[in-house]
């Protein structure tokens, strides 16, 4: 009996030791997971499914240490109490099981885009934008691409396509002026009114606009931002500090969680 009891204790100790090692594996946000911190915690966007996961602030001190490519906090979250290591490791294990975290090394995301300070005005470009019909084919191709893939499980492929197109624009180092961008924005707005409304369709509209500009070799940034209390997600397109399809005041109420384009 003593021998069996000793064996059981040794076996239990081995299991606990193994569990401890497993729990402390180096972790990374996976390639399709995007994260940002807010005052009351963090939000993770799981791009493969389009799902958002909320993380309470009490877990953040441990996650910042354990997840190697966790975004810079900049002291955004207000942490008053910390979760225990056991609780934090349980959360990490759950995120690994869901594919949100991985043990395979993944790079840290590049810096967030500049905060928009104004909406891009198009008044001076209206007369010089040309006939919208000359841009119709590029508009239709962009609209068609987004329409076919505008589902939560296809968002990753759209973001990937946009990233590739913007990377090619940066690689050839083509210089596009703000006037070029204004002309294309005017053409886009004139064409959009015949095909769909952007009301309550910020994600759809922003994807179509970003792809249209990319086809026209205009560097831009597609952004998804989030806020809490209540939770909201919003999408927009910007060039530098100018937002193209919203107001600066509105987008400033959101924290960018994903940015693809000129600033990345």
Spans of model-derived segments:
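Short, isolated positions in well-ordered beta-strands
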Residues: 53, 244-245
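Acidic, low-complexity/disordered tracts enriched in E/D and polar residues
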Residues: 1-65, 122-143
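Secondary-structure boundary elements
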Residues: 125-201, 208, 214, 238-239, ...
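Long, charge-rich, low-complexity alpha-helical segments
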Residues: 51, 55-157, 161-170, 216, ...
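Short, well-structured beta-strand/strand-turn elements
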Residues: 216-229
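Electropositive, surface-exposed helix/loop patches at the edges of structured domains
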Residues: 254-264
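A short, glycine/Asx- and small/polar-enriched loop/turn
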Residues: 230-234
């Amino acid at each position: 009996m003593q021998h069996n009891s000793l064996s059981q204790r040794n076996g239990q100790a081995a299991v606990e030791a193994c569990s401890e090692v497993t729990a402390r594996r180096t972790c990374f946000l996976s390639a399709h997971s995007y994260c940002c911190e807010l005052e009351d915690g963090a939000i993770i966007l799981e791009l493969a499914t389009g799902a958002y996961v909320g993380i309470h602030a009490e877990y953040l001190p441990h996650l910042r240490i354990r997840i190697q490519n966790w975004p810079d906090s900049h002291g955004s979250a207000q942490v008053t109490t910390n979760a225990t290591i056991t609780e934090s490791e349980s959360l990490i294990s759950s995120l690994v099981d869901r594919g949100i975290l991985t043990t395979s090394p993944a790079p840290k995301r590049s810096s967030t885009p500049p905060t928009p300070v104004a909406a891009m005005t198009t008044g001076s470009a209206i007369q010089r934008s040309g006939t919208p019909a000359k841009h119709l084919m590029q508009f239709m191709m962009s609209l068609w691409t987004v329409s076919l893939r505008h589902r939560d499980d296809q968002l990753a492929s759209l973001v990937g396509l946009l990233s590739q197109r913007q990377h090619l624009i940066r690689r050839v180092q083509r210089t596009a002026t703000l006037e070029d961008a204004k002309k294309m924005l005017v053409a886009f707005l004139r064409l959009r009114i015949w095909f769909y409304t952007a009301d309550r369709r910020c994600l759809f509209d922003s994807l179509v606009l970003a792809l249209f500009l990319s086809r026209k070799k205009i560097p831009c940034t597609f952004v998804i931002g989030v806020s809490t209390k209540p939770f909201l997600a919003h999408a927009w397109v910007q060039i530098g500090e100018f937002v193209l399809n919203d107001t600066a005041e509105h987008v400033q109420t959101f924290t960018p969680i994903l940015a693809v384009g000129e600033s990345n």
